[in-house]
């Protein structure tokens, strides 16, 4: 289970060092991880075993609706399988870095079964948007949580 928000830095080659405490769960037995684009201009980072059922469900959706086709192209079309190097770093494809507007400072944000990877500016904008929602009613499903 991935949780927490961690500020990290990309190196000059576009590599991200995955925190040691998450490596075994993210790449069990050296399996690749999957990185893909998200419509909110961040990246999704999944263990391969968690991504495959999602990919299969997406691929099985009919492509007649233009929105469905667009999401399939985004989520499956951008998906990259990558391994970690000996230093625990993953190379982020240039197309993915460009999509999410990633520069040096990034945020790795746990979402349970996967991570989101945000640019610093994108993450700060998300935080501001979240604070703006605090006066609104809770989203469906959250009402019963005792927080």
Swiss-Prot record:
GO cellular component, one term: nucleoid
Superkingdom of source: Bacteria
Pfam families, sorted: MraZ
Keywords carried by this UniProt record: Cytoplasm, DNA-binding, Repeat, Transcription, Transcription regulation
Domain SpoVT-AbrB: 5-50, 79-122
Predominant subcellular localization, coarse grouping: cytoplasm
Summary of subunit composition and partner proteins: Forms oligomers.
PANTHER family, A to Z: TRANSCRIPTIONAL REGULATOR MRAZ
Family per record: Belongs to the MraZ family.
Designated name of the protein: Transcriptional regulator MraZ
Native organism: Aromatoleum aromaticum (strain DSM 19018 / LMG 30748 / EbN1) (Azoarcus sp. (strain EbN1))
Gene name in the database record: mraZ
């Amino acid at each position: 289970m991935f949780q927490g928000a961690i500020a990290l830095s990309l190196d000059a080659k576009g590599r991200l060092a995955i925190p040691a405490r998450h490596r075994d769960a993210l790449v069990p037995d050296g399996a690749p991880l999957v990185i893909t684009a998200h419509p909110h201009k961040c990246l999704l980072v999944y263990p391969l075993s968690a991504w495959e059922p999602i990919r299969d469900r997406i691929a099985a959706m009919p492509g007649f609706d233009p929105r469905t086709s667009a999401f399939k192209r985004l989520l499956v079309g951008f998906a990259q399988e990558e391994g970690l190097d000996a230093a625990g770093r993953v190379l982020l494809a240039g197309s993915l870095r460009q999509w999410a507007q990633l520069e040096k400072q990034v945020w790795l944000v746990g979402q349970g079964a996967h991570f989101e990877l945000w640019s610093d500016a994108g993450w700060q904008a998300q935080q501001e948007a979240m604070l703006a929602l605090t006066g609104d009613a809770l989203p469906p499903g959250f009402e019963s949580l005792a927080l």
